[in-house]
């Protein structure tokens, strides 16, 4: 993205009016939807193989060529199975859509950087990009909250809404014509409902273009929500100060203090902490609050009316469930991490003086559990164990050397430790046991010996030591301290904020 920005270092007031006409000029109007598009689909004489990294110059040349010939490029052998997008990566339309997404990302990336500078989180933005940052948010916030709701962000019911929403952000008519063309040629515009199958195919065939449209839609969705939240916070401060003045007023009148404590305490508790905590992961969002369940209901209807009025999305109130966190465990799927989050209560007893009474303090602790059953199912699919979780050998790896076999299993254990280190250790040890025993059975199968004979012939403790010392070696590189500190860190839970992608632990065969 940086290599494109250096050509476009313009004043922001001139950027929207200058950017797209400069790159594409008037040729985009030649791509406007018309009846000729469906009639003039014939094949070019040659198949030009472009590089996957398309540039703005290639996109401009392609648009010029399409404008001059007034047709879309489809190849003969793919014409029966391809629509406008197709599955052939050499299609000109594929390159144009990718270049379109690149051009559109430039102004929005600048808006993101400016918003991060205003919020003062530029330095910690890399940590926020991690897929594990949501767990640190849970540990910091959810132990103090009581009600939560897991909401799926709905897709727009009609893709024309995306075009109209984009028109408010970028006032460029050629750009809107091009965007409308892509959406028009991909799906049937006579249908008012975008089906899940169409969206799934769209996201697979043009991931960058789809991610741009989806991120733009979510950005528009969250900007209005944050505006409402900010206004609600402002009202909270004003109301809070008013009630404090009433406290001071009634405190001066001694005979009204008791009346105030009976009649106004419940009202004051509502204004104690009405803030809504919001976090988004994948296509879902979570909003939670400390108390006042009717405040959560108010925000639920905010979402419903907002979707109806702004995006024409009809949603039923029963689709948004408000749960109490202290009674129900919280299940969610994020970045390939199927997790079960629950709150455990621990009692801490303290004694200030020898003759004083004991004080019991109940503390809430967030517990993240490794999903054992889905992991065992994945290990069984990769032939490391059977469906019951009993380790088996890996026959396809017996042709490799002993060092390569051990290294492959160590890599799996390392990925598991790195990815699930912030969760329960007990569940993680059970998964590692399957991998370690599968490694020993694979080596015994290679040397054509039984498991018992192989363990007698080979020093099993030396073999398994590499598995146990691997995590300590990793921690020693991160925390170069005493061995006691390393042992404490080995037993503790650590979330690594350098993980930006989903786990690929099992797909190593």
From Swiss-Prot:
Principal location listed in the UniProt entry: plastid
GO CC annotation: chloroplast
Biological process according to GO: mRNA processing; RNA splicing; tRNA processing
GO molecular function annotations of the record: RNA binding
Compartment(s) where it occurs, according to its Swiss-Prot or TrEMBL record: Plastid, Chloroplast
Keyword field: Chloroplast, mRNA processing, Plastid, RNA-binding, tRNA processing
Superkingdom, natural source: Eukaryota
InterPro entries documented for this protein: Domain_X, Maturase_MatK, Maturase_MatK_N
Annotated function: Usually encoded in the trnK tRNA gene intron. Probably assists in splicing its own and other chloroplast group II introns.
Family under the similarity heading: Belongs to the intron maturase 2 family. MatK subfamily.
UniProt-recorded name of the protein: Maturase K
Gene name in the database record: matK
């Amino acid at each position: 993205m940086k290599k494109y920005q250096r050509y476009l270092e313009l004043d922001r007031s001139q950027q929207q009016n200058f950017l797209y006409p400069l790159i594409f000029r008037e040729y985009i109007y030649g791509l406007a939807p018309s009846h000729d598009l469906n009639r003039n689909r014939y094949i070019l004489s040659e198949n030009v193989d472009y590089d996957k990294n398309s540039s703005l110059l290639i996109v401009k040349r392609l648009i010029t060529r399409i404008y001059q010939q007034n047709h879309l490029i489809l190849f003969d052998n793919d014409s029966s199975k391809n629509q406008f997008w197709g599955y052939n990566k050499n299609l000109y339309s594929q390159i144009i859509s990718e270049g379109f997404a690149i051009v559109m990302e430039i102004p929005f990336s600048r808006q993101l950087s400016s918003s991060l500078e205003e919020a003062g989180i530029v330095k910690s933005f890399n940590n926020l990009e991690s897929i594990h940052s949501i767990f640190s948010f849970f540990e910091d916030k959810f132990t103090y909250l009581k009600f939560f709701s897991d909401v799926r962000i709905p897709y727009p019911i009609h893709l024309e809404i995306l075009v109209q929403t984009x028109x408010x952000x970028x006032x460029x008519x050629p750009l809107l014509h091009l965007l409308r063309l892509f959406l028009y040629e991909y799906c049937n515009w006579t249908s008012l409902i975008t089906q899940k199958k169409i969206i799934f195919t769209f996201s697979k065939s043009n991931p960058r273009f789809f991610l741009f449209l989806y991120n733009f839609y979510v950005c528009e969705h969250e900007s209005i929500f944050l505006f409402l939240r900010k206004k609600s916070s402002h009202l909270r401060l004003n109301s809070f100060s008013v009630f404090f003045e009433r406290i001071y007023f009634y405190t001066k009148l001694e005979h009204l203090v008791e009346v105030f404590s009976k009649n106004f305490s419940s009202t004051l508790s509502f204004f104690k902490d009405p803030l809504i905590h919001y976090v988004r992961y994948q296509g879902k969002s979570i909003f939670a609050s400390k108390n006042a369940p009717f405040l959560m209901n108010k925000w639920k209807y905010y979402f419903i009316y907002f979707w109806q009025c702004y995006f024409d999305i009809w949603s039923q109130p029963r689709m948004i469930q408000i749960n109490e966190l202290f009674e129900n465990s919280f299940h969610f799927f994020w970045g390939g991490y199927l997790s079960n989050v629950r709150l455990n209560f621990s009692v801490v007893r303290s004694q200030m003086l020898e003759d004083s009474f004991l004080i019991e303090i109940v503390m809430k602790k967030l517990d993240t559990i490794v999903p054992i059953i889905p992991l065992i199912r994945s290990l069984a699919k990769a032939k490391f164990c059977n469906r019951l979780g009993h380790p088996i050998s890996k026959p396809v790896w017996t042709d490799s050397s002993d060092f390569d076999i051990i290294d492959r299993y160590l890599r799996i254990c390392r990925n598991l430790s790195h990815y699930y280190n912030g969760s329960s250790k007990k569940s993680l040890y059970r998964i590692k046991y399957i991998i370690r025993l599968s490694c020993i059975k694979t080596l015994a199968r290679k040397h054509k010996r039984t498991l018992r004979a192989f363990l007698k012939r080979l020093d099993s403790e030396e073999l398994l030591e590499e598995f146990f010392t691997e995590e300590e070696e990793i921690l020693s590189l991160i925390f170069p301290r005493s061995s006691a500190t390393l042992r404490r860190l080995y037993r503790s839970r650590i979330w690594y904020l350098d993980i930006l992608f989903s786990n690929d632990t099992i797909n190593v065969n």
